[in-house]
UniProtKB/Swiss-Prot annotation:
SUPFAM superfamilies: Nucleotidylyl transferase. Belongs to the class-I aminoacyl-tRNA synthetase family. This is Tryptophan--tRNA ligase 2. GO terms for cellular component: cytoplasm.
């Protein structure tokens, strides 16, 4: 889908940002590539449920994506609408979900600056999530400043939209706790105007890559994208890593660490059937080809309605653009309301 320039939404009278009767949830993604099954299991299925239970905001965090893709802005730009299309295909409803483009809400950047004064460099350096990411990216002592402080930007996002609930995995808990610390410090120092968010801890284990590696990633070539065809899914599944010691169907095999069974745990709607397959595989008598063919059927069953919705929205690209522009306008109104409260609490000039 070609990218259309997204203008910063024209401000109207801000809508009140009082604590909603239902929880307000903020979640989102960095638009650096197409979404895949890891996103579906880890967050998208939960978001589809949450949009009926909460006031759901989904952030296309293109500014955060630039902290480690600053030399590839075109990639980030092109993926904004691509990821929005993935959202709609996965089942997010424009009438229930507010989709916001981060770079089109300048209030987020201003709030980030105020929050930077409330956290120390040493505290940021101790964040285990950031430490792990710095090591993974091999930055050493050459960490871009924008990347180093992105947890503060995340805190500003959460506070600006008044989120009371934030879905996170175990690895993201330190990030959310840092947000809570910043919010508490702001409220104690100035005035209690910001909501302190709570964590909704994901119970879904992270899907491994098709090659058995810990992370599924399109850039690593070990992912099944939400937009993959049935034939592409079949080809990728047949090439999946399994137990290297399971050479013949009659051999006992290992289920633990076998991504085929991890995927079945995540997507097969019949746990009893999965358990029976595991028992048979462990005992010997179940070949990799047979269990992979079953996984192909399961995954294509999961992806079939997603493909149908994708085709509908691909025929109506204006609907995808409206999802983003109207959501961003709504998001900016909420962020402006919060920023106004922040400025008054800080007694800034003119407030």
């Amino acid at each position: 889908m070609p990218f259309v320039d997204l203008e910063v939404p024209t401000m109207t009278t801000p809508t009140p940002a009082a604590t909603p009767a239902r929880p307000r949830v903020l979640t989102g993604d960095r638009p650096t590539g197409a979404l895949h099954l890891g996103h579906l299991a880890g967050s998208l299925q939960n978001r589809v449920r949450l949009q009926d239970e909460a006031e759901l905001f989904v952030l296309l965090a293109d500014v955060q994506a630039l902290t480690d893709h600053f030399d590839r802005p075109e990639q980030v730009r092109e993926n904004v609408l691509a990821v929005a299309l993935d959202y709609l295909a996965a089942g997010l409803d424009p009438q229930k979900t507010t989709c916001v483009v981060q770079s089109a809400v300048p209030e987020l950047a201003e709030l980030t600056v105020y929050f930077l004064n409330l956290v120390t460099v040493s505290h940021l350096r101790q964040n285990p999530t950031v430490k792990a990411e710095i090591a993974q990216k091999g930055y050493g002592e050459r960490v871009p400043a924008g990347f180093f402080v992105y947890p503060v930007s995340q805190a500003a996002d959460i506070a600006a939209f008044g989120a009371t609930l934030v879905p996170v995995g175990d690895d993201q808990l330190p990030m959310l706790e840092q947000t809570r610390e910043i919010v508490r410090r702001f409220n104690a120092l100035y005035a209690p105007v910001l909501a302190e968010p709570q964590a909704q801890l994901s119970r879904v284990p992270r899907l491994p890559g098709l090659d058995g590696q810990a992370k599924m990633s399109k850039s690593l070539g070990n992912a099944i994208a939400l937009g993959d065809s049935a034939d592409e899914v079949a080809r990728k599944v047949m090439g999946m890593y399994t137990d290297p010691g399971h050479l013949r169907a009659s051999d006992p095999g290992r289920v633990e660490g076998n991504p085929v069974f991890t995927f079945l745990d995540a997507f097969d709607p019949d746990p009893a059937r999965v358990q029976a397959l595991k028992d048979q595989y462990r005992a010997g008598g179940l070949g990799d080809v047979k269990v992979k063919k079953h996984l192909i059927d399961v995954l294509n069953g999961v992806l079939a309605p997603i493909r149908t919705r994708r085709a509908e929205y691909e025929r109506d690209p204006d609907a995808v653009l409206r999802f983003v522009t109207e959501g961003t306008a709504r998001g900016r109104e909420v962020a402006a309301q919060t920023l106004g409260q922040v400025r008054r609490a800080m007694r800034l000039f003119g407030h």
